[in-house]
Amino acid sequence: MKKILVVLVVLASQFAGAQFIKEKSLNLQIGYGVTVPYYSVDEVASGGFFLQGELVLKATSWFEIRPYAGFMLTNSNGKNLQDGPSDEMAETKAFLLGGKVRVRAPIPWIAPYAEIGIGTSIGKFETKTYFSYYDKSGVIYHIPFSFGLELGRNNNVDIGLTYYFHPSVEQLAGAFAVGLTIPLKN
C-alpha cells in the first residue's frame, strides 16, 4: 500500500505546476563585455563579447525568478584606459550558470529594475595586477547584479548593465546588454 501511495504522489507532483508562476518567457541578451580587476594601479579593462539567455518566471507584476545561462569572452590588449601600455590585466573566458531574482517597477512603457543572485562560472580567469595574480581554470562561484530598464508596451525590450563579481579571482566581469523577451505558452 505504501508503494502505491508513493507512486501516486510522485505522478501527481509531475502533473502539478507551480501555482505562484503567472507567466513564462525567454529573455535573450547580447552585449559588450568588460572585465576589470578589483585592485589596479593602471586602471585596466579588457573588452569582449557577452551573450545570455534567461527563463523568466513571473510571480507578480513586480517580482520575477530568472535562471540563466550565458557566455562571457574578454581579452586584454595590453593597454590601460588612457591607452597607455600596462602590465596589468583581467580576462574572462567563461560559461555562466545561475539564478537571480528581479524586482521591477510595474510601469507601462518604461520599467526600471534591479536583480541579484548566485551562480557559477566555468572557464578560464586571469587577473594580473601589482596587488594580485590569479590564473585559474575550472569552476568558481560568482554573484550577479544587474540594473536597467524594460521598454515597450509590454516591457519586452531590456537595456541594462549586468555585473558578475568573481571574489575568488578578484575580478568583475560586466556587460552593457540589450535583450528581447519572448513570451512562452503555458
Model-predicted regions and their roles:
Residues 31-37, 70-74, 117-123, 162-166, ...:
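Outer-membrane beta-barrel pore domains and translocons
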Residues 72-79, 141-186:
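Predominantly the C-terminal beta-signal and adjacent terminal strand-loop region
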Residues 1-4, 19:
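Positively charged n-region of N-terminal signal peptides that target proteins for export
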Residues 3-14:
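Sec-dependent N-terminal signal peptides
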